[in-house]
């Protein structure tokens, strides 16, 4: 997170609150030197006095098993430590008996990483050396990421705190889904996303490769799929193999998704004979649910799918394959005489039963290919075998229902990033809350969860700021114990991890400034940056209603520049909550908040001046008009509260009306501090 012109004063005040003794209630420290910035938090952590000082003589060695995958992981971790410290640490192993870091691994792990891979590790750091132990190479990878995060400055040195960590994930399936069907994402985006995933211990890259808007994977068996269904934007088989290898080198599985029988316009443009009735003439540019679908009644459909999936399993070795299965709406399934006759002959009472029949047929193909089926929660049907995995996107109820029926499940409801919700809200969604009324055996069926980044309103320029750093907070929910729920401390650590992710090459912090410069055509964006820091995109649905986005919409507006859940949201909320605990005594927080509100008011004239020469920036002119009044309201509220005086009659009503106006649609962006400001107003007496 950058401070600088936005408000170093505010940032310092907020951090002073966060770095307090109460901030570490979950992970008490025995050594004042140690600041627990780990994300995700480990299962067990103990701290002892002391530290291991890092010097250019720092070296590493291995004992037990080693291979090229492990060596590469260690060298990558050491390279990151070099960048973090500026120390000239040699990138080669020494004798384990004389090195500061010893990595001891029991074995390679599985030839094809699976959901059952042992990811546990232990890390012991003394003032003399650090020892990382793991049963598998993947476990060592997880421990190395913890080691990187433990490095911290101490005076004019960099040190590792003396800690003992025993760690393993709460859930075995911790994924991130990237939709490359609606908007294609270049290989570079995919690779840096995988780098970010590894840093926060995610282990499944769910690659959404087909959609109504595009077929993104090369098929040599059916070349028209990309020739007619991709606009030339697709991954060659060699590129896909490269991504699989890149992910494996970081302990991440790649699970491909091929949408069927719905969301299949791109299939049917190329092979119209597979359609249930009408066939599309071009890939779909609009978003939403299409009424085209593969025909479940034709044997030709299954022969096609068999040949296609056989080809794809030669590229994607993971034992799980996602068939989509959601939002299948085909009028022909209710009206076509031929399809209705088929349903009658097979005793299929409705379209849901017909789709279950389709899923069963596809499942037989996958079984022959030694693959497990995954699908969105619409596939849940008693006719399916129990080894099918149900991914819940419409709510946690379907996840629980599936477990009650004996199905393994993944939760994505609550982790949809296109809703532009704050990290803190995602963070408190639990795939398996203690309140879930499941038996111990049923609870084991909940494999974990996946973050979902749908691509209707993102492209290669904006994806990083939509995925990161919020995904890091969700990654902690998947890895750490259920008891780790301190939202304030999560945000404190998220700030540190966000900077670490930027160091890996992610653009989530730099993209905003670059976009603001492009909007205005100038490098003079100090005041615009400050103005932008309190605005964020509205949700996917709100934006669609206001802008009617399609695949052809150019994503270069102010809404595309600003980040969801920018740091100011939590910083201001934290300061206001603290101030409201003792408004008559807490002069320090009042001073910090007054300074911040004044900065917001002062930023507006320069921004309005820039709007005169930037039509795209002028789209948020109403927000520029509203900000000074909102900031003034905050100052007034604190003045009444700190003095212990009442506001004039009607003051609260007029200010709440101002809030209501500021919450109405304008410029496809919303203010980040409205809820916190409302709490200030509510505390004032009249």
Which residues are covered by each model-predicted region?
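Bacterial N-terminal signal peptides that target proteins for export
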Residues: 1-12
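Bacterial N-terminal signal peptides
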Residues: 11-21
